[in-house]
UniProtKB/Swiss-Prot annotation:
Organism: Pyrobaculum islandicum (strain DSM 4184 / JCM 9189 / GEO3)
Superkingdom per UniProt: Archaea
Role noted for this protein: Binds double-stranded DNA tightly but without sequence specificity. Involved in DNA compaction.
Coiled-coil segments: none
Protein name (database record): DNA/RNA-binding protein Alba
The keyword Acetylation belongs to this UniProt entry's keyword annotation: yes
Assigned protein family: Belongs to the histone-like Alba family.
Length: 92
């Protein structure tokens, strides 16, 4: 069984990411990393808080938060800088 799983947070509803995270922990994964860029950052934060406070209270803790910036190709081939976040959740 894998000890770490990465979930990329994007355009789907927040509940999809919450369910994926809870299922990973129920399958025996010890650490889940939520990664998001741009507008999805707030969705990743909401996912982490919902898992910690509502779905697995007392069992999961937010271990680390990394704030990053990624360079991506924008329209017209120009390079843009986009904010990114990595939230590490671990079983307590």
């Amino acid at each position: 069984m894998a000890t770490e799983q990465t979930i990329l947070v994007g355009k789907k509803p927040t509940t999809n990411y919450v369910i994926a995270t809870v299922m990973a922990f129920n399958a025996g994964v010890k650490k889940v990393v939520l990664k998001a860029r741009g507008a999805a950052i707030s969705k990743a934060v909401s996912t982490a808080v919902m898992v910690r406070d509502r779905f697995l209270p007392g069992k999961v803790q937010i271990k680390d938060i990394k704030l990053l910036s990624d360079k991506v190709q924008g329209q017209g081939g120009r390079e843009r800088t986009v904010a990114a976040v990595e939230i590490v959740l671990e079983m307590a």
